[in-house]
């Protein structure tokens, strides 16, 4: 949960680097929250037919900016520009490439986007 909160606190931090653990823990908690909120939407009758419910929509809006920020920092950790995020516009293949990038280890030591986040206290 600490990793999730770290991302939320740095919700406009598009500079710097994000470790794999920071990124994937944020994604995992998002999946869990979205699932739970989806169940609540369904139980409360707040889910539109074939669409998102009220709670999941509000949650999605709230984490939209922090998700982009951590995605940019994750790309920076692999010494890639945030422009690589444009691959999200290419269905399936672009998404797969981004997943591969997000699974790769960050560059050891300092890179052009900042110091190694593993070495920071």
UniProtKB/Swiss-Prot annotation:
It is a multi-pass membrane protein. The keyword Transmembrane helix applies. It is found in: Cell inner membrane. The keyword Cell membrane applies. InterPro entries: DUF805. Residues 1-23, 71-80 are periplasmic. The chain crosses the membrane at residues 24-44, 50-70, 81-101. GO terms for cellular component: plasma membrane. Keywords: Cell inner membrane, Cell membrane, Membrane, Transmembrane, Transmembrane helix. Residues 45-49, 102-121 are cytoplasmic. To E.coli YhaI. PANTHER family: INNER MEMBRANE PROTEIN YHAH-RELATED, INNER MEMBRANE PROTEIN-RELATED-RELATED. This is Inner membrane protein YhaH.
């Amino acid at each position: 949960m600490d990793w999730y909160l770290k991302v939320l606190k740095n919700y406009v931090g598009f500079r710097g680097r994000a470790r794999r653990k920071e990124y994937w823990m944020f994604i995992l908690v998002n999946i869990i929250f979205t699932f739970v909120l989806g169940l609540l939407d369904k139980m409360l009758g707040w889910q539109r037919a074939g669409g998102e419910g009220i709670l999941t929509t509000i949650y999605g809006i709230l984490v939209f900016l922090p998700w982009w920020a951590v995605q940019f920092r994750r790309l920076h950790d692999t010494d890639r520009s945030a422009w690589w995020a444009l691959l999200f516009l290419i269905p399936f293949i672009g998404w797969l490439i981004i997943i591969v990038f997000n699974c790769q280890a960050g560059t050891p030591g300092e890179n052009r986007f900042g110091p190694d986040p593993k070495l920071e206290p």
